[in-house]
């Protein structure tokens, strides 16, 4: 009897972890966008007016729980919880629930960035949160939950990142470290996540997962409710989990400890794609991209060119400030069939702490758009760049096809097909790419969705005529505005 019960428990745990890798996308949609620091009302409108019509699959939203108020309102104050009340500068619980419903109604899922590792860092005296809740972080007193000192690990600093105890039980940059093995802490975290599930979210990005023991997270995840069928989720659907685990290789706490619980952020993807498109590694080597580079298996990897943290760091990672290379890297990211793709939507920043666009009263302001739909008032909105949203459409059009017809010039010019549905060419050399290449597409004329669109039967940008053998003449000049060209069957004239 014991053996049968143990086997049943292991089978259930395995099926739950497998289910937590499913992002619950509509139809052929398969790209998430991180609308970093957007207000809930603005996200709802964006789902209805842009993301849904353009085929985006989901939105990662900023933390929803009450946070500390820090001088100047830096973005990172959102990562210092005071309570689990759903009131932030992005809006209140009613506005959040309205956003989730409206986005689900147009096929755009919502994934919440959640903070299970810690509460706020030290604050002199009494801290007041965005919902008006008082706390004394220095005393580990958070009555809005409530948490007291006994709910936290003993105070210590991470000085050795190769020491598992320090990484998982000491304070990450001074943030008060919760004890996830505590029944009370577990119950409050599960209650918080279940409330979000009740409101209709599809899953969670788990911040600082590396700093929590995988067995504690497994208990929390397995205790969560199924997704809310009133929001279009099938019966018995499990929340999609993707976990922030920074692992550059040879880490004491490894990404592999978390990959069976849900997807894991593949930070090496971000670093290596930046290296390649900055010219530090020839694009020809990208033919074996993915597991061939030592990355996680595709279904366990959350992939991105940059995220809200590493876009602010020096190094290989690309961001919006290098637009030509960034758009090429993003095009490759969305064209190559590896990983669960997320694109970034940023606001402009001059330093690490720059707050989101705000008014004189420190209220987040709504994005404004020019006649082309681009953001103009401090929001970057990379997801509204034609070269990026067009590749979201490309990714949808070629879903479930494989790489064929790889070509390269032995250096930084590459092309490949996605079955007989799509074709991508990139020129990252300082000389032109001008060549007849195999597009693998049926005979006809196709619009390049990078330089323009198919409108009323005509291309507003470049076009390529494909002959009966699948070949077309491809030209990407070294000084062209964009170093990439993309064709797919849904952009055939």
Curated annotation (Swiss-Prot):
Give the main localization category. Answer: secreted
- From what organism does this protein derive? Drosophila simulans (Fruit fly)
| Compartment(s) where it occurs, according to its Swiss-Prot or TrEMBL record | Secreted
Catalyzed reactions per annotation? Endohydrolysis of (1->4)-alpha-D-glucosidic linkages in polysaccharides containing three or more (1->4)-alpha-linked D-glucose units
Quote the record's binding site residues for Ca(2+): 117, 168, 177, 211
Locate the active site: 207 (nucleophile), 244 (proton donor)
Its lineage reads: Eukaryota, Metazoa, Ecdysozoa, Arthropoda, Hexapoda
> InterPro entries annotated for this entry?
A-amylase/branching_C, A-amylase_C, Alpha_amylase, Glyco_hydro_13_cat_dom, Glyco_hydro_b, Glycoside_hydrolase_SF
Provide the protein name: Alpha-amylase-related protein
Q: How is the cofactor bound?
A: Binds 1 Ca(2+) ion per subunit. Binds 1 Cl(-) ion per subunit.
Protein encoded by which gene: Amyrel
